[in-house]
């Protein structure tokens, strides 16, 4: 298989939704866990690609997307942009579920209504990112290559630091972030937060 990294194109959006779902259970396939396959992508992938496409890079294998890295240079500004331009239509489409609904779909709909958590902001690390690769794209150095491309783009924009969140069960991802030079910032509710200062 031939792999390559390229900038995001709007035609990639359905693939981003698919990859987000297929890696959405702490790195494992979450397809069977959600009735609505778009919910994860509505929160964790699509708004970044739509609102900050210049920070979205796609890994392709024989021309087909199989991974991505995306994020924002300024978490606070991104949160505000999502409130203005992204979540409104989704909140209309997905009403708040009943409290008795304990499904994963309901949890994601509640997250869409709550929006991005202000408590997850780290002032010294204003940017944040998400990276997901399908299993056949892992282990060949492409995750590192995507991360390097993203971090270089942040540095060129003068961003001083970046953070990310990862499920505590996603041991492989935690090791990858540590190898990339990320350090622990915080933890809680099954999530770990890592950060990296960027020299510009």
Tell me what each language-model feature is:
Residues 1-11, 200:
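Conserved N-terminal entry element of GNAT/NAT acetyltransferase domains
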Residues 25-44, 80-95:
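Conserved GNAT-fold acetyl-CoA-binding loop/helix
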Residues 34-56, 62:
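Active-site rim helix/loop that mediates acceptor-substrate recognition in acyltransferases
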Residues 58, 64-73:
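Conserved beta-strand in the GNAT
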Residues 75-130:
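Conserved acyl-donor/pantetheine-binding loop and adjacent beta-alpha core of acyl/acetyltransferases
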Residues 76, 163-165, 178-196:
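Conserved catalytic-core motifs of GNAT/GCN5-like acyltransferases
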Residues 125-127, 154-167:
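Conserved GNAT acetyl-CoA-binding A-motif
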Residues 130, 139-153, 175-179:
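Conserved acetyl-CoA-binding loop-helix of GNAT-fold acetyltransferases
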């Amino acid at each position: 298989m031939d792999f390559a990294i390229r900038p995001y194109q709007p035609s990639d959006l359905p693939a981003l939704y698919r990859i987000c779902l297929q890696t959405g259970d702490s790195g494992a396939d979450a397809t069977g866990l959600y009735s609505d396959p778009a919910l994860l992508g509505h929160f964790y992938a699509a708004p970044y690609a739509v609102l900050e496409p210049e920070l979205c890079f796609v890994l392709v294998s024989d021309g087909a997307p199989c991974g991505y890295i995306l994020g924002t240079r300024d978490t606070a500004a991104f949160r505000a942009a999502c409130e203005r331009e992204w979540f409104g239509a989704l909140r209309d489409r997905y009403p708040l579920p009943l409290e008795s609904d304990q499904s994963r779909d309901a949890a994601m709909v509640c997250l869409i209504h709550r929006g991005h958590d202000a408590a997850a902001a780290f002032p010294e690390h204003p940017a944040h990112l998400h990276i997901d690769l399908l299993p056949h794209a892992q282990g060949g150095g492409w995750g590192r290559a995507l991360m390097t491309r993203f971090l270089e783009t942040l540095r060129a924009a003068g961003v001083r630091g970046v953070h990310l969140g990862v499920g505590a069960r996603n041991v492989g991802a935690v090791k990858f972030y540590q190898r990339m030079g990320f350090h622990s910032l915080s933890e809680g509710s099954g999530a770990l937060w890592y950060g990296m200062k960027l020299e510009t």
